[in-house]
Regions:
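Cytosolic regulatory regions of ion transport systems
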Residues: 1-114
Length: 114
């Protein structure tokens, strides 16, 4: 099964890579060009793009069978990222919260109950 992980922290990316690679075909979507280059040099499959844009997910070949993991680090608009992933055809979207606050996740659940 294919997995697209939208992450911006290197520690989270490396941890997910170690955990998911045995069972999934994992690709990471990052916004930072230096981070993408560093991860690519380390042998990880990385794409560079804006996670708030639908065309980014279309380029990553997101389908209804693609698992999309979105890191909530509290810095970006989570709703726009999730909406873009769903508009591109993603049906399996999960939020990985790396902040202490659950307020953002609750707001997203109110907007998108499924």
């Amino acid at each position: 099964m294919k997995c697209l992980a939208v992450c911006q922290d290197e520690l989270v990316i490396r941890t997910l890579h170690q955990v998911l690679v045995p069972g999934f075909e994992v690709e990471f979507l990052v916004e930072s060009r230096p981070l993408a280059r560093k991860l690519h040099d380390a042998g990880l499959q990385v794409s560079l793009g804006d996670p708030r844009r639908v065309d980014t997910y279309l380029k990553a070949d997101v389908s209804p069978n693609t698992l999309v993991l979105v890191q909530d680090n509290g810095r970006r608009s989570l709703r726009r990222i999730v909406d873009a992933a769903k508009d591109a055809g993603g049906a399996l979207v999960y939020i990985l919260s790396t902040t202490a606050s659950t307020r953002r996740v609750e707001e997203l659940r109110a907007h998108t109950p499924e």
